[in-house]
Amino acid sequence: MKRTYLAVLALALTACGAPAAPAEDEFSLPTAAAYFTTACPEAGTKPATDKELTYWSMWTKDEPQGKVLRYAADCFTRKTGVKVTIQWLGRGYLRQNLLPALNTGTVPDLFDQDLTTVKAAIVSAGGTRALDDVLSLRTGDGTVRDVLPAAYRDTSAIKDDAGRLFAVPYIVMGNAWWYDRKKIPGFTAPTTMDELYALLGDRSVALDGDIGYYAAWYFDQLAARYVGPGGLARAAQDPTGRLWKSDPGFLKAAEHTARIATHLVDGWDAGKFPQIQQRWADGDAAYLFMGSWGPTETREYLAKQGGDQSIDYGSFQFPLPPGATHDVIEVQQIAFGVTAKAKHPEAAKAFIAYFLTRDLLAGMPAVADSLTPRSDLPVPSDLADLKAALEDPAKKHTLFMDGLDGVADGTFAEQVFYPANNDLLRGKLAPAAFVDRLATATAAFWKTQG
């Protein structure tokens, strides 16, 4: 997925419930080619009146995800008679197209995007309608509530301020430390920070430092383990800036982040994405902390290079640092929303339920190498370690960057957090000075917001 997270998506959840019960029959993923030749499943929910719907998508029609969604839309038409008109608008459309349209009569019925961006841009503007009733709709193999684990539907990340569901997910993204199993035989995941530092060795960590979102992940991951889900977002939204200093976890996280910075490859802040990520794929670095799209991007790069080089992807999570008590794992979801002014909300909701049918949603892992919220779908081998971590009941789900990147519609991260974090990684700020700067810059930022 490409990049600055939506800005990373435009450039590539605080509760964890038990996974949904698996389907009774064992299911194997089809090949990418076979997926598009499988029979369309029956629709568990058919609109009583709507005969059409308009869908604005964050994907392009030629992307694997777009191809899967187009196929599902065609199947939906065959099984329900509802015509689906799709506009393939790309990653930035939410703010460029949908947000300006909210005050007009020209809005789609259905749209999709990551939760952070939807909440910051569309929910905050009153542009969505509640989707709690979708949970009771039938997919082709159970209700939506049956097939979606609570971890992906019963969290603050996917609910508005009134506690209403504003979106329904169909793709799950995580992040992890990635390595090549072929190059590190007998690998054992670190269980302490000292073990992690020993593992990282000398200048072995790849980072495209020109992407502020990527560079922020080290501090973000560590801080979340000290202050818990919601802690980063609260500090970012504190108009006094004092929370950065009153909770000692932020300073401890900064100290570990500064130490990780000593393991970054030379030139990490001098390249242009994806140069450093490609160096990792070429074997110039041993480890890469990246989202679940990392294997797809690096595999595509190696394929374009030619030759027989390949990566046997393995991954692991950050260990708990000393004194930390929150064993978290970051999650982001791509989800469907229905606009408040939708002319065909019944059809839009029925399509959401239909796409969550196992045989249709299987296209996301089979064709697009993407994780889904359904626990009964097999996953690409590259993502098996990450999927296991996401489903570990001992881990608490938290939103990517705790949603900090969506604060003040993203301007807080761009103006305050990313610059300070980059200076911490470069050694221009000591950990204590970094926390001091966040405190003063946060207070100054909110004074300018009125």
What are these regions (language model features)?
Residues 30-47, 118-174:
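Hinge/lid segment of periplasmic solute-binding proteins
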Residues 160, 330, 368-378, 388-446:
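C-terminal capping/gating helix-and-loop segments adjacent to ligand/active sites or protein-protein/ligand interfaces
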Residues 237-269:
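Glycine-centered hinge/linker elements that transmit conformational signals in sensory
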Residues 17-19:
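Bacterial signal peptide processing site
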Residues 71, 78-148, 185-188, 279, ...:
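Extracytoplasmic "Venus flytrap"/periplasmic binding protein-like
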Residues 185, 262, 303-369, 448:
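Extracytoplasmic/periplasmic substrate-recognition and gating elements
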Residues 161-170, 175, 195-242, 249, ...:
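Extracytoplasmic/periplasmic solute-binding protein
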Residues 49-61, 82-87, 110:
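Short, well-ordered beta-strand elements
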